[in-house]
Amino acid sequence: MTDSPVLALTKDLISRQSVTPEDAGCQDVMIARLEALGFTIERMVFEDTTNFWARRGTQAPLFAFAGHTDVVPAGKLEHWHTPPFEPTEKEGYLYGRGAADMKGSLAAMIVATERFIAEHPDHQGSIGFLITSDEEGPFINGTVRVVETLMARDENIDMCIVGEPSSTEVVGDVVKNGRRGSITGDLTVIGTQGHVAYPHLADNPVHKSLLAIHALATTEWDKGNEYFPPTSFQIPNVQAGTGASNVIPGEFHVQFNLRFSTELCNERIVERVTQTLDQHDLNYDLKWTYNGDPFLTDTGALLDAVVDAVDSVNQTKPALLTTGGTSDGRFIARMGGQVVELGPVNATIHKVNECVKIDDLEKLTDMYQKTLENLLA
């Protein structure tokens, strides 16, 4: 039996070993399909990252699909039931690295757009595609660079669906209408190394830091709001000492991360952390990594169109959530437009035996097409 268009394209993309930041020809496949629809293509290669911006139309509003062709490494091959880059159908599922994150979404976007344009060749507004090979990596030369390029020429996306795997049980049961911000601090508290038998000749930075670290860990940063939970402070890494049991360390390294809501901003977090550390009279060095601001699409035409599209396919409305990690939506939101995430079930993403339900690919395509119809028909 011949594969459906979305299944065939998903298989083609999975078969290309596009481990971040490699694209492995995935974007060439997508570009060929979009050029046939009359899209203008702009390839943007920054350092080791392949990106493209495609647009059909010149009028407002500008609606865009966004996604990534790169995938995480497959891991230990012996743990896979089937080769990760040989797409395999089994009991109604399609297995392969990237099936859910997010080559299935990319295929659904392309096929939905083909169907929409076939029915509405003179559609309203404009359709765009913002695609990168650097979402799973350091996110330095990917979507953020494309966004900066577009903003510099005042070409701003009004509405965007990011194809991240947002769903939990069935496709479309969750739409992410926002994400928390993320900021990481790398703290080094400086003491004086010495022998544990002579503590008066040393200055233990671990002991000096504990009260400050406890204060940060127990701080109520905010109460959250109707869209976001309270800000979370977590310590993923600590390091001190030489490994010897008789040496007081000279330095204590603590890495912490805050996932924060729209109730906070980077500047306020830095200010409060610095105040806490200074109150405990520490000699320290603190470096910050800004991973992204929170964003929220609480109302608007895009959200209405997506909710209606999901409801038309599933006969039930999706939950609107802001949970989970960061995504490239945080960069696109800088343009000031509406951004949501809608994609496959995320139960197997980044795992061995990653898979997507084949029927879900068809449903996701229908949801994307219906969204286009709601906005631009």
UniProtKB/Swiss-Prot annotation:
GO annotation (BP), single: lysine biosynthetic process via diaminopimelate
Q: What class of enzyme is it?
A: hydrolase
- InterPro entries according to UniProt: ArgE/DapE_CS (IPR001261), Bact_exopeptidase_dim_dom (IPR036264), DapE_proteobac (IPR005941), Peptidase_M20 (IPR002933), Peptidase_M20_dimer (IPR011650), Peptidase_M20A (IPR050072)
On whether Cell division is a keyword of this UniProt record, the answer is no
- What are the entry keywords? Amino-acid biosynthesis, Cobalt, Diaminopimelate biosynthesis, Hydrolase, Lysine biosynthesis, Metal-binding, Zinc
Cofactors that this protein relies on: Zn(2+); Co(2+)
Domain of life, per UniProt, equals Bacteria
What are its E.C. numbers?
Answer: 3.5.1.18
State a single Pfam family of this protein: M20_dimer
Q: Which PROSITE patterns match?
A: ARGE_DAPE_CPG2_2 (PS00759)
List the active site: 70, 135 (proton acceptor)
Q: Which GO terms describe its molecular function?
A: acetylornithine deacetylase activity; cobalt ion binding; succinyl-diaminopimelate desuccinylase activity; zinc ion binding
Q: Which residues bind Zn(2+) 2?
A: 101, 136, 350
Binding locations of Zn(2+) 1: 68, 101, 164
Q: What is its pathway? A: Amino-acid biosynthesis; L-lysine biosynthesis via DAP pathway; LL-2,6-diaminopimelate from (S)-tetrahydrodipicolinate (succinylase route): step 3/3
Reaction catalysed by this chain? N-succinyl-(2S,6S)-2,6-diaminopimelate + H2O = (2S,6S)-2,6-diaminopimelate + succinate
Q: How the cofactor binds, per note?
A: Binds 2 Zn(2+) or Co(2+) ions per subunit.
Belongs to which family?
A: Belongs to the peptidase M20A family. DapE subfamily.
According to the record's subunit comment, the protein's assembly and interactions are: Homodimer.
Function according to Swiss-Prot or TrEMBL:
Catalyzes the hydrolysis of N-succinyl-L,L-diaminopimelic acid (SDAP), forming succinate and LL-2,6-diaminopimelate (DAP), an intermediate involved in the bacterial biosynthesis of lysine and meso-diaminopimelic acid, an essential component of bacterial cell walls.
> What name does this protein carry?
Succinyl-diaminopimelate desuccinylase
